[in-house]
Amino acid sequence: MAAIQGIEGVISQLQATAVGARGQETQSQPTMSFAGQLHAALDRISDRQTEARVQAEKFTLGEPGIALNDVMADMQKASVSMQMGIQVRNKLVAAYQEVMSMQV
């Protein structure tokens, strides 16, 4: 039964794509502004860092069920998320500076 539901989901996606290709409007979900998406991404980065810190604290306190490899994986994920956020910021600053240096 789950396979049928999965197939129905794929079929509905294909139908939505076909309607979009014909130029007809579909019931679209509300889109988030750029600032909203940026804020949500920063919140996800912050949440990931908080989760990694909490995992590390639990491991340090010796709570059962917290393995070192899980802590290290969470900390690495938080680090990669932060590096990605920094790179996005750098690209945004570079794009802003380029636009500001254009002559009108």
From Swiss-Prot:
Pfam families: FliE. InterPro entries: FliE. Keywords: Bacterial flagellum. GO terms for biological process: bacterial-type flagellum-dependent cell motility. GO terms for cellular component: bacterial-type flagellum basal body. One of its GO terms (molecular function) is cytoskeletal motor activity. It comes from the Bacteria. It is found in: Bacterial flagellum basal body. The keyword Oxidoreductase does not apply. Its main location: other. Belongs to the FliE family. This is Flagellar hook-basal body complex protein FliE. It comes from Salmonella arizonae (strain ATCC BAA-731 / CDC346-86 / RSK2980). The lineage of its organism: Bacteria, Pseudomonadati, Pseudomonadota, Gammaproteobacteria, Enterobacterales. The gene is fliE.
